[in-house]
Amino acid sequence: MKVRVFYHDKCFDGACSASLFTRFHRAMVAPDATYEFCGLVHRAGALFQEADFLGDENAIVDFKYSASPRITWWFDHHESAFLSAEDEAHFRACQQDPVCSRRRFFDPNYVSCTSFLAHIASTRFGFDVAPYAELIHWADIVDGARYESPQSAVEMPAPAMQLTLIIEATQDQAFVPRLIPLLTELPLAEVLEQPFVAGLLPPLLEQHQRAISLIRERAEYRDGTIFFDITDHPMEGFNKFIPYYLYPQATYAIGLSRSSFRTKVAVGSNPWTRATESQMVNLAKICERYGGGGHARVGAISFPPERGEEARAAATTIVQELRAANPFPSA
């Protein structure tokens, strides 16, 4: 059996989910299966190509829903998991079917897709997830922004955080598929020591320092919200906690950036804010207005690279909205 595993690319939780799914599937479903890993990214336009679903089984983890009959497994935890009302209706109908409901799973209450998948694999199928406790723990910390402080998040002392930097920045399409099996084979510190991994870290740490300097130069902080535009310095990703490292008093941060395949509006909130949940704006709902999505506390919108002005207009509107909703008017 050939299984194609589609995962959220450029994402630590996406890679961890793909690795854990593979372990679970091999142990509980198909011991002799072979696995191929295919990254998915949020971009303007179609997110899926039906022609890519070539496996005897096709799984999607940590990414939006597809109603394709070729999809045999789906796990996600994003509040904005459905591209359309029709997709959500398809999933709800699936839950009434005893076969389909044992293959497609969704719960936005989980911090990471990895921990959600671990819960389903253990409680529904009897899969032992104890050997993967470190992976599950760090997937929750990374995807849930559960770092102790902005300094910890930006200075990245832990192997999982350094792996996250590499996963988010790499341009080698073969790198993450090669990495995925190791995430459930070795401790994360040993994964980081692998020759094909270790050599990537020093230049990325230098790039990370340049990103800190650039965002420090560009960031505009007012009324509880940071805004920065770095579209004239194309980069494939940056540490999303840098704004709060620079302005720990901020509640929200909006970043406009450009990569090889999109212009991105990143819409985030400070994980260490003093604001209560009732004082916070649901960022997923804001992003959905522009075709994006995410979670209540963090989201993003993708535009084609050439539609930079449209992205800038959206970012400007969102900044104005969040500054008007500042939970601490004196800040």
Question: Could you tell me what each predicted segment is?
Answer:
Residues 144-238:
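Glycine-rich, Lys/Arg-enriched anion-binding loops that position phosphate/diphosphate groups
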